[in-house]
Amino acid sequence: MANNRAVRVGEQMKKELSDILIRDIKDPRVRFVTVTGVDVTGDLQQATAFITVLGDEEERKATLAGLEKAKGFIRTELGKRIRLRKTPELSFSFDESIQYGNRIESLLRDLNKNDSNE
């Protein structure tokens, strides 16, 4: 069973992280980013933020580089907004589930077209 506190902290971090990325990050590489989820370990020491980026592969890499550069600032801001003894160490990862879902949807659409043509 998942640690309820870790889940609650993850949801709060997702909300605050989204706000920080929209309002406080001035890096032009960090644009069109959506935070889709945050997984926090049970001991609240590490957190992985899952993001999606609108754009091609080059823009995704540039965005990830910008987020890695701003990681210290983001962690400091999270520490100010969320009352924890220690702010979790952040890492960023791309959320592939949306692309996977779109691919499945297009495959199903193609199957339906083929069935209707036959």
Swiss-Prot record:
Keyword entries, A-Z: Cytoplasm, Ribosome biogenesis
Domain of life per record: Bacteria
Compartment(s) of residence: Cytoplasm
Pfam families cross-referenced by the UniProt entry: RBFA (PF02033)
InterPro entries with a match to the protein in the record: KH_dom-like_a/b (IPR015946), RbfA (IPR000238), RbfA_dom_sf (IPR023799), Ribosome-bd_factorA_CS (IPR020053)
A GO term for molecular function: ribosomal small subunit binding
Biological processes per GO annotation: maturation of SSU-rRNA
Recorded GO CC terms: cytosol
Family that this chain belongs to: Belongs to the RbfA family.
Job description of the protein: One of several proteins that assist in the late maturation steps of the functional core of the 30S ribosomal subunit. Associates with free 30S ribosomal subunits (but not with 30S subunits that are part of 70S ribosomes or polysomes). Required for efficient processing of 16S rRNA. May interact with the 5'-terminal helix region of 16S rRNA.
HAMAP family: RbfA (MF_00003)
Assembly: Monomer. Binds 30S ribosomal subunits, but not 50S ribosomal subunits or 70S ribosomes.
Protein name, entry field: Ribosome-binding factor A
Species assigned in the record: Shouchella clausii (strain KSM-K16) (Alkalihalobacillus clausii)
Name of the gene this protein is made from: rbfA
